[in-house]
Regions:
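Flexible, small-/acidic-enriched active-site or ligand-binding loops
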Residues: 154-184
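A short pocket-lining beta-strand/turn micro-motif at the edge of beta-sheets
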Residues: 54-56, 121-124, 163
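Conserved PLP cofactor-binding pocket of PLP-dependent enzymes
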Residues: 119-140
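Structured core elements
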Residues: 42, 57, 126-127, 166
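A generic structural signal for well-ordered coil/turn residues at beta-strand boundaries
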Residues: 37-39, 119, 160-163
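Acidic, glycine-rich segments within the central catalytic cores of soluble metabolic enzymes
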Residues: 1-112, 145-155
Length: 184
């Protein structure tokens, strides 16, 4: 989609290069930037100096009501009347100022505090999690998002992806993989 837009109009408003830099004929790498038409970014949170995963991913949606909820959750009510921020098109042109201010807001909060504050306001947000943090989250096992399999032998127990939803009375059976030649 981004490539089609770039080919058609020559720029991508949701990318950090807009409006100050020229676009080539391919979609540029976007770093921490969401590339889908919304202002999404990965922000440093409290502890980032020693924890490589002390970040939260926050999305500012384009809709006026969604942006109002986000601005109020941040305590940035001034954005609602500031012509640099009070429309989606204006925000596209001033995205670096948005990233900077939200970054200052997030830096003294843990990724879980950021997630708690913003999710209560309906702002799309999530903590950046390591594989270890994901594997230690019991709720993911409770809902079959992750399952533990005891393979036995040298492999022992390992974690894999489960089926976290119901399909017409189908209940998946989890168990060890067949040994080499064991399923022939």
């Amino acid at each position: 989609r981004d490539q089609l837009t770039l080919d058609r109009i020559g720029y991508l408003t949701q990318f950090p290069q807009y409006p100050d830099q020229k676009f080539g004929d391919f979609v540029p790498r976007s770093g921490n930037q969401e590339g889908s038409g919304v202002l999404g970014w990965t922000y440093k949170c409290k502890g980032w100096e020693t924890d490589p995963n002390a970040y939260a991913y926050i999305i500012l949606q384009r809709g006026a009501k969604d942006f109002e909820l986000a601005a109020k959750a941040f305590g940035f009510d001034d954005w609602l009347t500031n012509p640099d921020f009070n429309t989606a098109d204006a925000r596209d042109k001033h995205k670096q100022a948005i990233y900077d201010r939200i970054g200052q807001w997030a830096i003294d909060k843990t990724k879980y505090e950021v997630t708690d504050i913003l999710s209560k306001a309906g702002v799309p947000v999530a903590p950046v999690l390591s594989t270890k943090e994901i594997m230690e989250d019991q709720s993911l096992y409770d809902g079959n998002t992750l399952v533990k399999i005891d393979q036995g032998g040298k492999i022992g127990e390992f974690v894999t992806v489960g089926v976290p939803f119901t399909i017409s009375n189908y209940q998946p059976v989890y168990g060890p993989c067949p040994e080499l030649g064991g399923n022939t």
